[in-house]
Swiss-Prot record:
Residue ranges of coiled coil: none
GO molecular function, one term: chemokine activity
Gene3D superfamilies: 2.40.50.40
Organism ancestry: Eukaryota, Metazoa, Chordata, Craniata, Vertebrata
Signal peptide: 1-21
Name of this chain's protein: Lymphotactin
Gene of this entry: Xcl1
Subcellular location: Secreted
Species the sequence originates in: Rattus norvegicus
Secreted recorded as keyword: yes
Function: Chemotactic activity for lymphocytes but not for monocytes or neutrophils. In thymus, mediates medullary accumulation of thymic dendritic cells and contributes to regulatoy T cell development, playing a role in self-tolerance establishment.
One family name in Pfam for this protein: IL8
Disulfide topology: C32-C69
UniProt record similarity statement: Belongs to the intercrine gamma family.
PANTHER family: CYTOKINE SCM-1 BETA-RELATED, SMALL INDUCIBLE CYTOKINE A
Ranges annotated as biased composition (Polar residues): 98-114
Amino acid sequence: MRLLLLTFLGVCCFAAWVVEGVGTEVLQESICVSLRTQRLPVQKIKTYTIKEGAMRAVIFVTKRGLRICADPQAKWVKTAIKTVDGRASASKSKAETIPTQAQRSASTAVTLTG
């Protein structure tokens, strides 16, 4: 009886492990049914994607993870895109100019021996 129960438990665990991976390769498709007309505060926007198709839209992703569709021709949307792009390039250039700990140590060592 215990062997049967142990075998059944093993089969259940194996089935759960196999089924867990099914469907993970399917991409999440964002579909806009309506476009937001009210302005979204730019400081709440984390990133965006541009959706082409039957309904062209810009999909903003907020810092809380919400997806909001907006009209790509709206003036506030164009301004928000420029701001988010500027924020991304500013943080990228800032990351490139900050020296690492090893670089700081090397420059200190050169200063001390010079």
